[in-house]
Amino acid sequence: MSRVKRGVTARAKHNKVLKKAKGYYGARRKSFRIARQAVIKSGQYAYRDRRQRKRQFRALWIQRINAGARQHGLSYSRFINGLQQAGVDLDRKVLADLAVNDKAAFGALAEKAREALAA
């Protein structure tokens, strides 16, 4: 049986991990064993936070819509309910953008929601 020398593959594996750990502080950047743990943990954080980002943006959009709706005398829930009754089919991302960047259009939507609630 011939001897297997793993110097090249081991070095390549180490370099791959150390490259991912570039920019980390101290031994997390230099030591393979510690860097490997840091890279694995960073992957876990990234996986978790890709899902949390969707929740956080939706919460931000709702806060912005609520603030815009209250400037027009409506709560968030009544504003959304009024839009649904009026048949306005805009998602929260678009509504939040209108509340921040186009206050006139958002005001028109608020008026439409108020009319639908009154009817």
UniProtKB/Swiss-Prot annotation:
Respond yes or no to whether keyword rRNA-binding is given for this record. Answer: yes
**Entry keywords, A to Z:** Ribonucleoprotein, Ribosomal protein, RNA-binding, rRNA-binding
**For this UniProt entry, which segments traverse the membrane?**
none
The name under which this protein is listed is Large ribosomal subunit protein bL20
Extract the SUPFAM superfamilies matched here: Ribosomal protein L20 (SSF74731)
Entry-linked CDD domains: Ribosomal_L20
One Gene Ontology biological process: translation
NCBIfam families in the record: rplT_bact (TIGR01032)
